[in-house]
Amino acid sequence: LDDQGELFIWLLASILLVRTALTFFMVPYLALGAEITDDYHERSRLAGMRTNLGWFIGIMASAMALMFLFNEENGVDGRFVIDNYCTYGWINGFLVIIFSVICIAGTWHYIPKLASGAAHVGNNMLGELMSTFRNKNFRYLVILDMALGGIGGITATLLMVTYTYFWKLNATETSVLFAGPVVAAVIIVAVCSGYLNRVFEKQQLLRLTCLLTIINLLWLTPLKLLGLLPDNSTLVFILIYANWAIQVMMSILRMIATQSLLADIVDEHELATGKRQEGVMFAAAFFSAKFISGFGYLVAGPFLDLIGLEAGVQPGDVSRTVLWGLGLIMGPGLALIMLVPMWMSFKVNMSHAGQLAVRQALTERAIRSDSS
């Protein structure tokens, strides 16, 4: 499409359709985690397996595309060839269908095994949604997820741009950074998550990951902006690799803690109201995060215009304004936004002992209900 207006309409419609389809799939997918098991640690292990696989497969797809589809041919950088993105879209669409069918077939037998409270069906969707926000812990986690969604939207939009123009990496180096740190992070989390779950409670792990993420965002890009790093050296590449590996590791651990805490909040809400609303709760949390992540994408585009990054410009030809803009938003800027999740993580008031007490009370209620 040559017309900017038509291109905007097409992109907007495509994003809305993709997000809608993703929501219809992800809400029951996430909510089912609260029904498969009611064990405190088992929920963390389940969320860990799901999150690790999601990160690993998602990033490997991008890395493989950079290596084999967007690689340099005849002196032309494949990232700047429009036709490559069409092929990339078709391949991803085919893979989404395959893995969705596998997921649906693998979890189908859990549908009849819902908790007894799940049988409640409300006739006022808005009322059901608002009732979930009476739970303070749920409100805090939703706000936390919304802030993280904004950070995710900005990062997803500007990460490739930052690698290309701020760090001046080629396609091969970028593909290594897309895959390598994620693989390292997934392996470390898979090996250490059991130990971390025994040492830390979920809310403690949530606070720790928020704090370490802020620290990790504040050291690398400022060093580059202040001229304290050599240009295009092996050392710089290793530092970028380590920085992104830490970032991904903290993100995975935080997602595991958040999803597992949401499953516990479903129990807490059921005890308080007599209604089991895991679908509504996970839908509200997921929609809020994705809604704000959309604003992250909206912010990133005008931001690139603001700092003066022109379409098609080569990495070595950008101005210092572009470099400073990218460095500030992808480092201190994101750290500033991370203060919101950090604040919310300290307001969450949950514990292992509290969850055991909730499960015990629910069991006793179910026994009394069956006996009557």
Can you name each region flagged by the protein language model?
Residues 1-372:
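Membrane-embedded alpha-helical bundles of multi-pass transporters/translocases
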